[in-house]
Structure formats: structure tokens, C-alpha cells
């Protein structure tokens, strides 16, 4: 019996892939740092073993899948090579796996995870669908027709894939530790476009995506009249959003979604366009759109007394804009409070003014110290450099969250890609202690 061993199983993509293989009746185990990470909950529910890193975890007969964050010098990878066991990097293994299905890659600087989650939810309402979402969620179906997966542009990892379809949500400059500029980002997406086998669904409102060249049809969606799929007559309500879809200027149907903000309409349009081209029944699409509950760390909302707490992964100015816009649509009468933790020194420095501009759209801003990722832990920049660019911004630590209590009827949005959740947890605990 083959055992699949994951080196770095708590990574968001790795965790999802492990879940898929387990659901397909394979034996799966993995290793990682002992620090608890949100992705391990789904692994534990499936009784997938999570071991501390140890070269003795590697044994003959295993299939070794290694996370991209771990170098060839990692003790388990070295042990595998000493035993002449091939080591499959995550993105290469995923590329091989998806070739067995009608595959749909969802990529873009922003909106990948939400769109992948929405597409998976809609498709599985009509056909058996396996999916891999970048929030650590994976689901495998043995007789799948479709394989829907999130494809990341960072370090051009998505060039390991040759999908049947690609949804491209947008092109924006991010990951300044790797990409030189927007032209470098575009070149990566252009190269990816040439690897797609059946068709590309791209946001036509995005100026960069308008320039994409491909060997397959490129179908554009968006708000502009030149798009193949266009959203019109948009009704933004506190219980979701309703809009009409026109296909090449001909009315197609009216859809309701559970999401808020223009970005949610665009995500849904991409899904509607793909389903149209795969002849998925429109009534099934409409129903599934109304039952989507979202993905982890993307506008996850919970009430707490008179306040509302939202947990969101937003870590780029464009994403912060979208999250604040969505909060204002759903809660038009409430004070919007942003609690933001910048992620990586390189990104914070590159987009310092843009971060200040986007955060200033909240009524009050609190800033946590910069979170240095595993890729870089040093920088001369400090959080005060961002604070002085935002009127009234205050600094906050996980021991001073009680200051948030004064926003009696506020919507508190905890945003970031680092460990912002510990600040949220500290505040929730603070409130619970005070209520006793």
C-alpha cells in the first residue's frame, strides 16, 4: 500500500492536496512545525497523521510531496534522496494529478481563493467535482468530472500547470520580493495563457488582461459594455447582491449572490461564464450561487454583542478597498473600524502610500506591527512609517485590544496575511472576560 508523505503538510495548498488524496481513498500522512495552524483542523477531522519533522518519517515505498517553502537541504528531503525516493514538489504533483480531469485553474492577483471556492460550490451542484482551494480546503471525488484549483502566480508556480480552462481575475503588482514590476507580472500571466488548452475566462475591465494573447478563445467578463459577459442593473442590498447578465448584449438571466461589493459580482460573473461554456444548467448555477457560504478568511463575519467582527485575508491595497466596500454595503449605518497587520516588509515598503489611501476609507484605523514572513524577517521600515500617513491611526498590540471596546456599534475588520487572528482572539477573550 502506497503512503503519501507530505513535507510541510500544514501549508494551505499542501493541506488541501492531502485532503483530496485522502478522500480518493489513499493513505496520507505528513510532517510540519508543531505550532498550530488553522489548516490542520481539516486534516485532524480526517484522522490524517501530522508528525514533527524528523528524517525517520521518510521510509521506502512512500511517495514524497514537498512544500515549496522547504529547500532541498531539509532533513526529510535529504533522507528521501539517500533512499533514492523521488521527491515531488507540490506544484508539479498537482499538475500531474489534474491532467486526469477537465481542469479549471483560477488565477489572478486578487480574488483567487473566493472565486475558486465559488466555482467549486457551483460546479459540484451539477457534476462530481474535486477541488483545491488556497484557504486550506480540499475535497476529492473518485469519479470526478472536473478538477477546480487555485493557481498562484508567485515565483511563476502556475507555469507547472496545463489546464483545460483558466479563469484570470486580474493582473496587479504584488510580491515585490519576486516580481520586478507590473510588466514582469504580465509576462508570467502571458506565459500561463499559452499553456491553457480549451479557453480563458478573463476580466475584461482589467487593462492588463485585455492585452493577453492565447491560442484558445479568450472570453471577457465585467461591467464594461465591450465584455462578452456583462453585469447590468446591479442591486446592492444588505442581504447580498442581485444583477442581470447579458451575453454579447443579449439578456441571459438574473442572478442573486450572497456576496458584497463589486469584486463579488465579478467573481460570480467568471463562474457564470465558465458554466455557460460547459453547458451547466443555469437553474443549477442560480441555486448554487444563493447557497454559497464563502471560504475561510475571506469576509468571515460573526456578531459579538453589539459589534460585528470580520476576519479577512486582505493584505494588498486593492483587497483592503474591496473588503471595506463590502462592509459598507452590508452595514451602511455602522462605523467601520480597520485593524490591519501589514504582511512582509517588502510589500509594505513598496505600497506604503497605497496602503494609507485604502485604509483611510475606514472610519478608524488600528495598526499592528509588520509581520515578516519566512521569506524575509528584516527591514528598516517600521509600522510608524505607515501610521503617520493615516489621520488618527493608532498602534495596537495583542495586549492592548481593549481599546476596541469603545466602538460600541462598530464593524471591526481584522485584516492581514500574517497572524492577525491572534489579535482578534485576544480581543474576543478580552470581551468574554469582561462579560463574566
Swiss-Prot record:
Enzyme class: ligase
Assigned EC number: 6.3.2.8
GO CC annotations on file: cytoplasm
Reaction equation(s) it catalyzes: UDP-N-acetyl-alpha-D-muramate + L-alanine + ATP = UDP-N-acetyl-alpha-D-muramoyl-L-alanine + ADP + phosphate + H(+)
Pathway of action: Cell wall biogenesis; peptidoglycan biosynthesis
Keyword list, A-Z: ATP-binding, Cell cycle, Cell division, Cell shape, Cell wall biogenesis/degradation, Cytoplasm, Ligase, Nucleotide-binding, Peptidoglycan synthesis
Any single GO BP term: peptidoglycan biosynthetic process
Record GO terms (molecular function): ATP binding; UDP-N-acetylmuramate-L-alanine ligase activity
Binding site for ATP: 108-114
Subcellular location as annotated: Cytoplasm
InterPro entries the UniProt entry points to: Mur-like_cat_sf (IPR036565), Mur_ligase_C (IPR004101), Mur_ligase_C_dom_sf (IPR036615), Mur_ligase_cen (IPR013221), Mur_ligase_N (IPR000713), MurCDEF_pg_biosynth (IPR050061), UDP-N-AcMur_Ala_ligase_MurC (IPR005758)
HAMAP family: MurC (MF_00046)
Family per record: Belongs to the MurCDEF family.
UniProt function note: Cell wall formation.
Name used for this protein in its record: UDP-N-acetylmuramate--L-alanine ligase
Originating organism: Bacillus cereus (strain ATCC 14579 / DSM 31 / CCUG 7414 / JCM 2152 / NBRC 15305 / NCIMB 9373 / NCTC 2599 / NRRL B-3711)
